[in-house]
C-alpha cells in the first residue's frame, strides 16, 4: 500500500504543482466495495479516504455502488475524500477514453482532490501503449479540475509502464 501511494505521489509531482494538502506522515485508507457503504477507517488519526468509483476490467465498465456513500461518509467525518478508478486499459486508447468519459462526470469528491488511476492489472505487453493510456487519463483528470495520481505497485510498473 505504501509503495502504491509513494509511486503515485512521485508521478503526480511531474504533472502539476500539488494543490492537495498533505503533510508528511498523513495516513488514510483505500476503500472499495469490501469496506461497506460507509467505509471503515483503520485509526482515529486517519486523515483521508480514497474510494473506488469503479473502473474498467475484462467485463467492461463497472461501478462500485458504495462509492457515493463512502465519499459522503468520509466528508461527514471531516476527512479528506479522494477517488480512484480501476484502470485496466490493455494499452488501448479507446478503453482509456471510454473510461474517462464515463467516470469523470460522476466523481463526487471536491475539485482539486486526488483522482488516481489504479493500474495494477490489465496491461498490454506494449509498454509504450500502457504508458500513453496512463498519461492520457492523467491529462483528462487534470483538465477536469482534479489532481491526477498513478496508483500501482513497483514490480508491475517496472514490467508494464
Where do the protein language model's features map onto the residues?
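Short amphipathic alpha-helical surface micro-motifs
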Residues: 12-15, 98-99, 152
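Substrate-binding cleft of extracellular glycoside hydrolase catalytic domains
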Residues: 23-146
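Aromatic-lined carbohydrate-recognition surfaces of secreted/lumenal glycan-active proteins
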Residues: 144-159
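Sec-dependent N-terminal signal peptides of Gram-positive bacterial secreted proteins and lipoproteins
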Residues: 2-22
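Generic alpha-helix signal with a bias toward terminal, lower-confidence helices
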Residues: 17, 41, 93, 156-158
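Generic domain-boundary/flexible-linker signal
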Residues: 60, 159-161
